[in-house]
């Protein structure tokens, strides 16, 4: 028995369908340096410039929900929650989606990231699609 319903059956039509990711050429990269944790976004469909790659903004994610003044991953702290909000919002373009899923995304995805990582936007969009479309109790 399938645990997912089609996107057309979903009540929340603002939810991104991973097959129609907003920027499938985007890759998020995280690394640690002396200044803390840095997350950048590179879009291979755009020319490399001062704005590509760009830093993922902690401040922008704090305007949605302020959990922490920094990003972090690999553990279940407030920095991981802030990164979860930032990634979900950047991928979905929707603050409500980020707020609905950030705690679960931090627990199941961000917490598992290694010290240095690269994640295509499509992976995050697929995570959203699967959790948004899972049947209750499945």
Name these PLM-found stretches.
Residues 1-2, 133-138:
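Short intrinsically disordered terminal tails
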Residues 1-47:
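Short, charged/polar N-terminal "headpieces" of proteins
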Residues 9, 33, 76, 107-110, ...:
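Short linear sequence elements within intrinsically disordered, low-complexity coil regions
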Residues 11-12, 36-101:
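Amphipathic alpha-helical packing elements
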Residues 18, 28, 84, 101-107:
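Generic hydrophobic, helix-prone segments enriched in Leu/Val/Ile
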Residues 91-133:
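Short, compact, well-ordered microdomains
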């Amino acid at each position: 028995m399938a645990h997912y319903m089609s996107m057309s059956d979903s009540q929340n039509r603002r939810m991104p369908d991973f097959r129609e990711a907003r920027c499938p050429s985007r890759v998020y990269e995280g690394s640690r340096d002396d200044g803390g944790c840095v997350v950048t976004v590179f879009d291979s469909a755009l020319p490399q410039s001062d704005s590509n790659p760009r830093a993922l903004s902690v401040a922008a994610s704090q305007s949605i929900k302020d959990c922490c003044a920094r990003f972090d991953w690999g553990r279940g702290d407030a920095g991981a929650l802030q990164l979860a909000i930032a990634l979900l919002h950047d991928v979905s373009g929707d603050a409500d989606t980020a707020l609905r899923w950030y705690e679960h995304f931090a627990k199941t995805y961000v917490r598992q990231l290694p010290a240095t990582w690269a994640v295509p936007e499509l992976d995050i969009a697929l995570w959203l699609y699967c959790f948004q479309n899972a049947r209750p109790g499945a």
